[in-house]
Amino acid sequence: MIKDIYKTAETFHNDFYDFLKAVSTQPKKLMITGELINLYVASGYDKNSGLYEFIEKIQETISLDHSVILDVRIKIASIKFYRISLEEFLIEEISSKEFLIYKETVAKPDTLNTTLNLNFKPFYDKSPAVRDIKYIGSGVEYLNRFLSSQMFTNEERWKKNLFDFIRLHNFNGEQLILNDRIKDTKHLNNQINAALAKLGNHPANTPYENIKHILQELGFEKGLGKDAGTITHNLNLLDQLLNSPDHNALAEFISSIPMILNIAIISPHGFFGQEGVLGLPDTGGQVVYILDQVKALEKQLIDSLKKSGLNLLPKIIVLTRLIPNARGTTCNQRLEKIYGAKNSWILRVPFREYNKRVTDEWISRFEIWPYLEDFAEDSYTALLAEFKKRPDLIIGNYSDGNLVAYLLAKKFKVTQCGIAHALEKSKYLYSALYWYDLEKYYHFSMQFTADLLAINSADFLITSSFQEIAGTEKSIGQYESYMHFTMPGLYRVENGVNPFHVKFNIVSPGVNEKIYFPYPKTKWRLKETKRRIENLFFSNSEDPDVIGWLDNPEKTPIFTMSRLDRIKNISFLVRCFGESEELQQTSNLIVVAGKIDETMTDDYEEKEQIRLMHELITKYKLHNKIRWIGKLLPKDESGEAYRIIAERRGIFVQPALFEGFGLTVLEAMTSGLPVFATKYGGPLEIIQNGVNGFHIDPVNQEETTEKIVRFLSDSYIDSSVWDKLSKAAIKRVTEKYSWKLYSKRLLSLAKLYGFWKYATNLEHEDINAYLDLIYHTIYKSRAKILLEEHMKR
């Protein structure tokens, strides 16, 4: 395959330049990959040639007078830009800044001289980065090697860093690792040897309490382990780090330090609660993710503290917004204990009032921005009151939560972790370039700025998949989309992120095994819940929240469940079903999504999708073949819903235009349902195509319908086809996706990046000043404009 543009132009000279001339004559001055491929095929060029393979690598073209500008994806996380003269047949590589200026020339030429240029590359050049593509998302492994090598090359400095770091940790003034009897690193070395000699006289299972006076006399406290064996192991690791540093020893020792007791998890938008919230505006998988995450983290913290010899109860607080008019939920209660947890809580802090007609109600995640600075300020005080001290770790979620995490971590001076869940920039075509036209709906000027601030301020970033960071050979990753972009008249980003940076780590979540489990486990299933869901789905009983009935409820159910918005793309599945006689003959469509009455929602995207759903059901005459359920299913009922569909040998379809990860995909698979899910986003890595599920193209209706029809047809002929895929789906989730593994890894990351932050704190002052400037001059000025609009409502 020819990847090099110069060789491509040489090998396919006539076709190459003829095609680019065809591009330059199109009405659209900006074209993307799919449009270029369609033009290539429509123009009669050979799809089997090396030229076609090169065209697939072009992400975008800009047509100007007598030239075409190309954005070419050389490989994963590597892009080059070219200007091609169609008069002189010249190819010239250009910079990202030049490419962005060309885009501005087409989109908004009057802003060329007023657009601020941002460039984070000088800061990234000072930081460690992985070199090989396959290690993207494994930042901590490279960081461990980097830190251990630094301990060799700058021995005295890093020994002191390590010594000061472990002396730092205490609980309520009581030292956890070292006490003041140990004065410096040389003394520490001697005392380790003395302690190891003393410990050698005691059996490995000797409790700490029996030997604590010996250890304390030597300068060691109880946080090194619960018994002589654990303490001996950890002291040997510390001895190795001081004398012969090794990346494995560094990771294991730092991970064993009891340095995290209090965690703040930030998620302001939507209705964050435990009951009756899923399906409300801006409320979905993120809430499920965080609640499951909290329980797993708390359990792991308790276990690790016990192993360290500490009988302490950690505390986790999920910080969210208090909504006065909470629509019958608990979202107007200040404090709520998390079910099944020992000391984990939801803390709700209200937005400051300003205009009560706005701030007493739910506020869209796209309009939340003017209130977040005050929210962070008030939350700082509230968190201090609850924890009685600063938290040890702050985890931000989504753009708004990550912005608040940035503000809080800066004020608390603690480790900041970011979890994007989904970055809106990659969902909406040209959302940055035409930001001004979209501003009244989405306010991307603030959201993309918040993302830039969060990405570049976080000590480490958690992603659920590789593609979330760096995409694929053919498509750009969510984070990668922040490398180069322009918002004409506001700012252009010449270099916004480095996907190779060590802050990126892939840590995939799991599912709540008490709620989502395989359908054959009948003893675990509640008969009343099963009866209720079967009645809702298949009985044709009248319900004001349900559209449609099933003439033949025994047909194979095709099931989908999600929020009802443009990105979730439920209407695509309805079209597939509505235009396929084969599917309608053999199957029914069961949709659990949103509301069925547009007057029952304030979300304008949901309103549009509700209208579209009604239009499609009427157009395709589906009223007797569909059950569209427009109400919330509690978590226990959603788990049973998957199992009931599996019991009837149905399938689950997730047709999103883009899915950051895909919790519903995991939930369906672990229930034993064959899954057809979007190939854009997390499901591309969750599902092994054809082995334990199927990838679908959410814009290719014919191909998607054909895949579903073929699988259902094969399953009717041979029941083992369905059985095999069902078992493989369960196996995939069981082996790969676990909250236990997730929580253990996240806490280990938090400790290692905490050490790195401590050891290199002064080196971050320059980027922090840059971020502060962006926040105050760009973000706050845009937020002020939106607040003024809200005050007029």
Swiss-Prot record:
Keyword Methyltransferase in annotation: no
GO molecular-function term, one example from the UniProt record: sucrose synthase activity
Activity versus pH: the note is: Optimum pH is 7.0.
Q: Region labeled GT-B glycosyltransferase — which residues?
A: 259-738
Which reaction(s) are listed as its catalytic activity?
A: an NDP-alpha-D-glucose + D-fructose = a ribonucleoside 5'-diphosphate + sucrose + H(+)
Q: What is its EC number?
A: 2.4.1.13
Question: What keyword terms does UniProt attach to this protein?
Answer: Glycosyltransferase, Transferase
Per the UniProt record, one Pfam family is: Glycos_transf_1
Q: What is this protein called?
A: Sucrose synthase
SUPFAM superfamilies attached to this UniProt entry:
UDP-Glycosyltransferase/glycogen phosphorylase
UniProt function note: Catalyzes the reversible conversion of sucrose and a nucleotide disphosphate (NDP) into fructose and NDP-glucose; although the reaction is freely reversible in vitro, the physiological reaction seems to be sucrose cleavage. Unlike characterized plant enzymes prefers ADP as a cosubstrate, whereas plants prefer UDP. Its preference for ADP over UDP suggests it may directly link sucrose and glycogen metabolism.
Q: Which organism is it from?
A: Melioribacter roseus (strain JCM 17771 / P3M-2)
| Matching Gene3D superfamilies | 1.20.120.1230, 3.10.450.330, Glycogen Phosphorylase B
